[in-house]
Amino acid sequence: VLQAGLVLFAAASLVAAWAGSAHSLIGARGVMGVAAAMVYPSTLATVPQVFRDRQERAIAIGVWAGVSGLAIALGPVAGGALLRHFWWGSIFLVNVPVIVIALIAGALLVPESRDPEPGRFDLVGAVTSTLGIGLLVWTIIEAPGHGWASRTSVLGFVGAALLLTLFVVWEVRSQSPLLEIRFFRNPRFSAASATTAMAFFGLFGFIFMITLYFQIVIGWDALTAGLATLPYALIMGAMSPLAMVLTSRLGTKLLVGGGMAVSAAGFLLASRAQTDSPYWTFIVPCMALMAAGMGLATGPATDAILAALPAAKSGVGSAVNDTTREVGGALGVAVVGSVMSSWYADRLTELWTPLQVPRDVLGAAKDSVGAAMSISKQLPAAVSSPAISAVGDAFMEGLRVGCYVVAAACLLASIAAFLFLPAHDRPDPEGRHTGHPQARTPQSDRPAAADG
């Protein structure tokens, strides 16, 4: 699956690089998403197969988590650099040589592993989950424009709820479920999964907010804005392996719960940002708190998810971990973006009304911060300067509320971790944890209950 996914991703990248229309580009990106869904869980699933020793596996998971977070944060830097010096297709073409190296290394170094009871592909589960999550994200994104209580928004939320409910019911009854819902009966497994989702909710929400702040409010180009996020990427990448070393001494509960609390503190501090906040003495400390907290939490949380399953089911644990990351990230962008958009639009209306800006111009400015900046510069001289200032103030109001939302999510994850995650897990002789639910077998239709 890993090798096939890499080949498919490389082929789709080549198509995307030379796409002749928006439709072909979107199609290629969709195929890249399918390929990524094949690759990403497979990378983590190999860790328990290669590293049998408990300590070695923990460090490997920490490195994996750190590299994952680092790659996400480095994306804007690489993209900005390529777009500055090459044509737009280079952001896809750069994937190919990396994949060639990965294919060779995978063939030589990665051992074969498979689920002894793989079951059949769950088409109903795949369709209902994709449609449900897709509809939910779309509704959240579009709600500020249509109105949160509008017919479109209400129907969207109801439809998403029905689809996701159908997904859960089907998964519980299915003999070959896409997602093993029964594992979530274990509060430790659920708390670790929720923490991972909230961490990536915060990570993607942060990248969304800070990119707009750097490019629109401060006025930096894409490369400079990407470079400005490097402290976040480097700190998170460094903290993840360190967290796995500390877990054996401090325990999963303290690392995950404390890490998410530290991230929440970073977002609360960031909520005090202003349009002229200094980068090195304010923005970087905020990023340091966010990144350090997430780096401390994500590795141990990932290890807790894998530790809940026997080694033969490591692919299931990896898939759950991947799902929580992707869903959390998608919801992070959707929720934070919608909240920011709503507060920004309301605040801009309040600030621009005394300037007597035409209603149609105000409507266009409310739809986009970038458009508002462009419009402000074209207004009469007496109005232009206060209009630009108002756009910045309105954006900061949205960013402030967005930070509150992410901080609340991180605090909830912290509370769940302190309540349900173990202080210390007990490794068995083969390096796996004990006291966690086992995979479904023909003799057992549900996982064993966790011990105290």
Regions found by a protein language model. Name each.
Residues 78-86, 140, 214-215, 246-247, ...:
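Interfacial helix-cap and linker-helix signal at transmembrane-aqueous boundaries
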Residues 112-127, 174-178, 426-433:
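Flexible cytoplasmic inter-helical loops of multi-pass small-molecule transporters
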Residues 97-114, 132-141, 160-174, 413-421:
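C-terminal membrane-cytosol helix-exit motif in multi-pass small-molecule transporters
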Residues 71-75, 207, 239, 298, ...:
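Discrete transmembrane alpha-helix packing/kink hotspots characteristic
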